[in-house]
C-alpha cells in the first residue's frame, strides 16, 4: 500500500506536466488545476513550437556534451584518487582524505565565486570547458571509489606483484575492472547532478548558443507572464535524456550502490 501511495505521489507531477503541455495557455490558467485533462483538444503542436523557438537541438547538444565530459573527467580522477587512498600507503594519506571528507560537507555554492573568477581569468566563459570545470574533480566520487577499492582482497594485488606487474599494470588491468560497478554508479550520479545543475550554467553562459537545458528552461519564465503549456512542453522534452539514461543503466545503478556502499 505504501509503495502504491509513493508511486502515485511521484507519477502525478509528471502526468500533470505532460497534460498541461497539451493545453492552451488560456486553459492552463483559467481552469482549476484539479481538471488536469485538456478540455479544448490535445495541442500536440506545443511541442513542435517549443522545439523550433528555443533551439532545443543546441540545448540538447550543449547539455549532453557537458554531461559526457563531466562524467569522463569525474570517473577518471575519482578512480585514480580512490585507488591511491584505498590501496596505497603514503605520508599524509589520512590528512588528505580528511580534507576530501570536509569538502563533501561544504555547500557547493560557496565555491561558485572562486570558480567563476578562475574560469573568467582563463577566458573560458561561454565555452564547454567553462561548463565542465566544476565537475573535473569530485570529492564524492573519490570517496565512492575508495570504498570500492577497499572492498577488494589484497591477495589480488599481491599475486600480481609476484607475477611482475608494476603499479600501473595492477591499477589498469586488475583493480579497475573489478570496480566497474562503482565507476558506473559514479557516472550515473555525475550525469544526474550535471543535468540538474542550474546556477553554474546561468552564471558562465550568457550566450543562448552555449547554455544548457536547465538554464534554457529557467529563461523561459517571463517577467510579466509565462506560457505555461510551452514551459511544460519544454520540461517534458528536457527530462527525456535522463529517463533514457536511467532506463538503460538502472541495473548498474543498483549494483553500484550495493557493492560500493555509496549513498547520495
Residue ranges and their predicted role:
Residues 2-264:
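A structural signal for multi-pass alpha-helical bundles of membrane permease subunits
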